Amino acid sequence: MIWHVQNENFILDSTRIFMKAFHLLLFDGSFIFPECILIFGLILLLMIDSTSDQKDMPWLYFISSTSLVMSITALLFRWREEPMISFSGNFQTNNFNEIFQFLILLCSTLCIPLSVEYIECTEMAITEFLLFVLTATLGGMFLCGANDLITIFVAPECFSLCSYLLSGYTKKDVRSNEATTKYLLMGGASSSILVHGFSWLYGSSGGEIELQEIVNGLINTQMYNSPGISIALIFITVGIGFKLSPAPSHQWTPDVYEGSPTPVVAFLSVTSKVAASASATRIFDIPFYFSSNEWHLLLEILAILSMIVGNLIAITQTSMKRMLAYSSIGQIGYVIIGIIVGDSNGGYASMITYMLFYISMNLGTFACIVLFGLRTGTDNIRDYAGLYTKDPFLALSLALCLLSLGGLPPLAGFFGKLHLFWCGWQAGLYFLVSIGLLTSVLSIYYYLKIIKLLMTGQNQEITPHVRNYRGSPLRSNNSIELSMIVCVIASTIPGISMSPIIEIAQDTLF
């Protein structure tokens, strides 16, 4: 009898939960329409994979790319709509969140063509790879719009779990297994630290989980200047630091970059930073509004360490992917300047603009590395010597992307850094901007060293990899070159394009 009553109660509770979820999806589903498109694409991928043979594999790429493009289109149609909070306060829709979602979708759209030939040559499972990429994209999009602590914790876990699986996708490669093990262990530790910081924030605010309600709760409980908030700030900064990978939270980055498949590295190098930057901006700016001096100081220290450590160690690297790993550590130091400046002096607009350029510069560089790696089977920097004599197009494309990463005029990277540093200077961050300028000059040194090797490698310096270099006969090679061309063009856009981009970015301020 007792079991029968308990069973009825369980059925009633399950029915209520289902009806509430259906009600939320029915009335709030329009707010996550771009995300719903990706979910539909995921379901369609599974259906086609389970009912088709190997000959229908091009459809998987087509469906993945189409769902991403349709999500971008849905975002653009929703542009400039009034900010809305949906799903009982768990998700917020506004221009600021949507532009970060657009950047994530753009990264994923460009990364899929990069992966086509690599997957075919390495004979990796196609469906699972695309599923992980789309699911990670979905997690990043939900993180950008997350408005409460639970969603901010769950969404990056969705992204991170797929990232762990992608980094260890080549199971026969010992370096890939090592990379995913380190990534998983350190990612799990950082998630624990992050949720511990959330628990302090939750308790100090009187049990609130929504970001704005946390501020109101801290005011009501008079805990906004308490030691508990300082503890929460430290733990949350460490937890978010793993996602952004600034120094000293960068230890996992070089090993994961070197051991993971190159298209995966291209995907992780940009999407994780975009999603984490969006989340960090809102977390620091809203719940820690009363502790702005404290988190400004913490981020300044992280930015200085990142710019110095990343660019100094990058000089000594012999692997192209490890060099880009340390370069990305330095690049995130520049992005942090925009987070510190905030919206009062155009910091967020400059950060968004620079991240848009960084996506094109970084993905363009990785596209060149994917092509070279597939044709030669090496990642060593010295093996690039004399590439210009064999493939001028690839060598020039790589040179332009590296020069843009270094910030040489008149390339896009120069104007992105210039605007970012100018906003920091106007905000009074003189020491931070000075460090940024010095480390930018330092980064140009190791980029130019690679370019010199590409263009002027002597006969005795040319390794057998370049001497026997030949183009790939695979037709899918065109997709990699297409992504590379798009990224190279975007990396070389002159300063005339800056004004409309900055105006759009300034419209995203909450």
From Swiss-Prot:
Keywords for this protein: Chloroplast, Membrane, NAD, NADP, Plastid, Plastoquinone, Quinone, Thylakoid, Translocase, Transmembrane, Transmembrane helix, Transport
Annotated signal sequence range: none
Gene Ontology, cellular component aspect: chloroplast thylakoid membrane
InterPro entries in UniProt: NADH-Q_OxRdtase_suN/2, ND/Mrp_TM, Ndh2_N
GO molecular function: NADH dehydrogenase (ubiquinone) activity; quinone binding
Regions crossing the membrane: 24-44, 57-77, 99-119, 124-144, 149-169, 183-203, 227-247, 295-315, 323-343, 354-374, 395-415, 418-438, 482-502
Enzyme class name: translocase
The EC number(s) this enzyme carries: 7.1.1.-
Reactions catalysed according to its record: a plastoquinone + NADH + (n+1) H(+)(in) = a plastoquinol + NAD(+) + n H(+)(out); a plastoquinone + NADPH + (n+1) H(+)(in) = a plastoquinol + NADP(+) + n H(+)(out)
Keyword Ligase among UniProt keywords: no
Domain of life: Eukaryota
Keyword Plastid: yes
Subcellular location: Plastid, Chloroplast thylakoid membrane
Biological process per Gene Ontology, one example term: photosynthesis, light reaction
Bilayer topology term: Multi-pass membrane protein
Subunit structure: NDH is composed of at least 16 different subunits, 5 of which are encoded in the nucleus.
Family: Belongs to the complex I subunit 2 family.
Protein role: NDH shuttles electrons from NAD(P)H:plastoquinone, via FMN and iron-sulfur (Fe-S) centers, to quinones in the photosynthetic chain and possibly in a chloroplast respiratory chain. The immediate electron acceptor for the enzyme in this species is believed to be plastoquinone. Couples the redox reaction to proton translocation, and thus conserves the redox energy in a proton gradient.
Descriptive protein name: NAD(P)H-quinone oxidoreductase subunit 2 A, chloroplastic
Species this chain originates from: Populus trichocarpa (Western balsam poplar)
Source species taxonomy: Eukaryota, Viridiplantae, Streptophyta, Embryophyta, Tracheophyta
Name of the encoding gene: ndhB1
